[in-house]
Amino acid sequence: MKTLKIPVLITLLLTGCGSNQVTSTSSNYSSSKNSSSTTSSNQIISSSIELEKVDLELPVFIGTQSGFQIDRNIYGTFIEHIDTCIYNGIWSEMIMDRKFHDPVATGVSQWSKNGDVENNQEVYKSAPYATTINKDGSITQLGIPLDENKDYDGYFYASGNGNLTISFTNADETIERKIEINSDTMTKYEYKIHSNVKNRKTKIIIKSDSNGIVVDSLSLMPSENYYGMRKDSLDLLKSLNAPFYRWPGGNFVSGYDWKDGIGDRDERQSKRNLEYCGLESDFENEDERLANDIIKIGSLGFYGAFEPNDYGLDEFIMMCRYLNAEPNIVVNSGLGNALDAQDEVEYCNTTNTEYGNKRVEKEPYNVKYWSIGNEMNGSWQLGNVPINEYIVRHNEFYSKMKEVDNTIKIIGVGDNHSNWSKDMLNNTEMDYISEHFYAERDEKDSITHIRSLQKQAEYRIDNHRKLNKPNVYMSIDEYAYMNAECSSRLKDGMGVALCLNEFIKNADVVKIGCYSSTVNATQGSLTTDKYGAHMQGNGYALKLYSDSMLDYYQPITFQRSKLKDEVFEIIGTTNIGKDKLAIAVVNSGEKKIRLTNDKFKKIESRKYVTADFLDDYDDDEYSKFRYYEENNPSSIVVEPRSITTFVIQL
């Protein structure tokens, strides 16, 4: 996978400014070498002793600092086993259906066969099937995206006596590895390959020269990975700087057994995805199977036919460590039960217990935040029951989980659009109550579109205040645009920024926020293709706020009548000493605007993202976003069509 581009640092010495120095950094935050920023993203930001020319000088006024500290967890995010968020997004496995969930060449299997190939249910590792390849028989899978000058690590388990030839072939090259199999029991065989060319349509062919060679649990990953995760995705997520990650769902969790996702990955059984069972489609014929692309079918298709369980609880914890983020685990209160949830807390947070001893590491994970269920108010949710029954269920989960670790923080299922939240708060115990909202898109009116998430946030927060439960805080752990395409545009990022403004303004009640979702799926903060990862509009918004915003809400006002025909919003935050101010500005219009205030002593930094059009987004061919970081700018200038943060000394 491609290494994240490191922005080039350009230093400008300002003539006549003595020791003052301005540094500017530009980047498009894309790890694909196909992506190249537009010419202007590589230009030096203009700085000189004379103030930059602008379209409008706008005085701003600083209000009174709020007394409620902003919880950084409001800049959190959410990953779910849905679409290509995990598999082909975060996870680096390149072989689909590597554990033969369906018999080869049947159902949703991504394997075709040639010659004498049998499906073997006497499996070693990953039920329900292994595959027996007899003399001159072979199995094939298409769509392996090999990259230029890249190394890959592969392995498989096999038994029998003979030779297997593994070929990777495309229009440009063929790579072969001949491996002798000489074992009556299933044994792991490893190999390495090096690709000289870039070809997304490489096919893997596994052929036997003898009868009775049984194969199971194949794998191929780039040599550069982090515990099986895509390094390009993780490095981009690290730059996102989200402090809080929610997992594994989402609707997915209500049909998920966490115990399926621990232990040796090759022994974890592939399971039918219960939440989305039936949404997969079989292939009409072999030609259709062979014609399909890796990203469009099977477990990597929308929602997915099955869950390979390669990415589980331990992998999630490893990812959070890499990202220096707080993990939030959602337990299954749909088809799951309180004892399984109790076991999960025991696995994560205890030693010398039944499940603590099953943990990969001796030291406990000490997971603090636990959610009991997801959207259990909804008829679409597996295990949905009326509120009076769910109250009993929640209380049982709460009691069993707290028996293991009384220090954990519990997030309960809420919905204050109905009476659900009221009934939950009056009859259960929890530390936070969850709220989800998905705003309608308006493709005809950009201003309405940008403000729609903000309006949803205002509505939900106002409803929560009316419930008058001051000791239970809001966890807005899913929010996004409804029915959105994968790539998030600049205007979607602006909508996320305005939503974050509401979280900041209401820091006394909103303590957790999780944008949905992090990778791909519903307008992911970043998107991936076969060769790279790309930061998108809402990702830039989250990054800017997480990187720059300070501890307390500081109201900023201005004469709004000067900016009537666009979205122009300013929000301020200060540190506890009140000597530093961080402001975020959303400007959907075409004016370049300078903000002025006599209290502004020194501008420490300006960071912003912009594009030529509000509908721009990044893809694998062209990077349309332009992201800049600038130290010690000469004035507070807001570019057209931008999301900007400034840190200012007062």
Stretches with model-predicted labels:
Residues S208, P248-G249, E354-V385, F437, ...:
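Active-site groove signature of glycoside hydrolases
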